[in-house]
Amino acid sequence: MGLGSYWGEVIDVLQEIIPVYDKVNSYISLGKDSEHRKRAIKGRIKNGDKILDAGSGFGNMSKTALDITNGSISIMLYDPLLPMIKNTDRLFEEKPEVACGVFEHVPFKDEQFDAVLSGYSLRDAISLKIAISEMHRILKKDGKWIIVDLGKPDNLITRFGVSFYLKMILPIVAYAAGGKLWLKFATIY
């Protein structure tokens, strides 16, 4: 699994929607994106941890982790889109360390990180199998990989509701939040 040959198209779209990316994501999650990040991170990261934010975008997962730990962690933002990681100033008082690259070829040593954060980004891997292998490689022995993303609910009624929302409601919400760029969101959702 993974995006495979569609990866380039998705990355091109992500680059185009940078100006409205956070706003639209907040709208289409009905304002729950921040809550989901907090719930995933709380209690899973300790003071002094070294964190890789894989597929970091602007660094929202890292910012949440820093807030929860009162800034007592070390973070590295890692994303394939240089314009995303260059625009982190609005979230961070001190510029975090950044690196540009993909999930499948992570330029870090084995067992280097206490935790890896992936917020709404793992679905954009070229190869899910290789991405998982790479994250496992760079995590310390007892490290944690904290993933926040959309999924298909097990309950059939809930699954129908989510599918209906994604196909029928999300485009309207994305248009309201992102203007003409909303059409691009269909490629990544």
Residue ranges, per PLM feature:
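N-terminal, positively charged/glycine-rich alpha-helical extensions of SAM-dependent methyltransferases
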Residues: 1-20
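A short SAM/SAH-binding and catalytic strip from SAM-dependent methyltransferases
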Residues: 115-127
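Conserved alpha-helix/loop element of class I SAM-dependent methyltransferases that forms part
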Residues: 30-47, 64
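C-terminal alpha-helical "lid/dimerization" subdomain adjacent to the S-adenosyl-L-methionine
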Residues: 8, 24, 64, 78, ...
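Conserved beta-strand signature within the Rossmann-like core of class I S-adenosyl-L-methionine
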Residues: 143-150
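Class I SAM-dependent methyltransferase SAM/SAH-binding core
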Residues: 52-105
